[in-house]
Amino acid sequence: MTGQGAPNMNEEKVTFPSDGLNLSGVIATPDGLQPGEKRPAMMVLHGFGSNKDAGGCVEPCRMLTAMGYVTLRFDMRGCGESEGEKARVICLEQVADTCNALTFLAQHPQVDMRRIGCMGSSFGAAVSVYAAGVDERIACVISAGGWGDGVSKFRKQHPTDEAWARFTAMLEEGKRHRARTGQSLMVPRYEIVPIPEHLRHNVVKGSIQMFPAETAQSMYDFRANDVVAKIAPRPLLLLHPSQDSVTPTEKSIG
């Protein structure tokens, strides 16, 4: 389906495959493209348990399309309108979704496959960096409010000894529950990533509120730091609010 998006752009709802699942996305192209003309493109990744219609995806896509880029925003597996086990958010699976999105976008007739970048915020920022570290096709990366080491990030987000003991006990109980029942232990999102009460109204409408404990474990084990050096000499821009109340600023690089 093709339709008029924001001024100076056209949007098309798309689906594409990722590990046997169909993912839902939106491609936006700038007005005025000439037949056969190819433009650089950017993939814009959503945050933790969010979706492609979040402002953090929609607004960057509008800005980039106004600048002449083709953009793709999409729902990761298990999120939004995409297929997959709902609420199962696993870091390395999202990396795979990102690489498969690139394969799809590279086939677009108005995209220069040599100039496809990736950007994301928060969880999507960490996934963007990791994906670029393992997939040389990604030409550049913009990370906004991301994190490089899951253990270090969580230690800052659960800062007291009591909070850390509670969090790590949840991880262990998740493993025992899975072994005992064959089912996932479901955990509220704010027990994984604490967000101050006064900021929770900013969580995107439709965001997932309960996750399997395996989600928290995958984040705990995730280390974009291990692959970030492989991005060079491709450009990498790390952005982070100086007073981030959710992901500590220094976690963008450590």
Where are these regions (language model features)?
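Catalytic nucleophile-loop/oxyanion-hole region of alpha/beta-hydrolase
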Residues: K52-A54, C79-G117
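The serine-hydrolase catalytic nucleophile loop
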Residues: G49-R62, M76
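Short beta-strand/loop motif that positions the catalytic acidic residue
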Residues: I231, L238-H240
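Conserved alpha/beta-hydrolase
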Residues: C61-E81
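N-terminal cap/lid segment of alpha/beta-hydrolase-fold proteins
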Residues: T2-E37
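Conserved alpha/beta-hydrolase "acid-adjacent" motif
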Residues: S245-K251
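Primarily recognizes the serine-hydrolase "nucleophile elbow" in alpha/beta-hydrolase
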Residues: N100-T181
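Accessory cap/linker subdomain of secreted extracellular hydrolases
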Residues: G145-M219, A224-N225
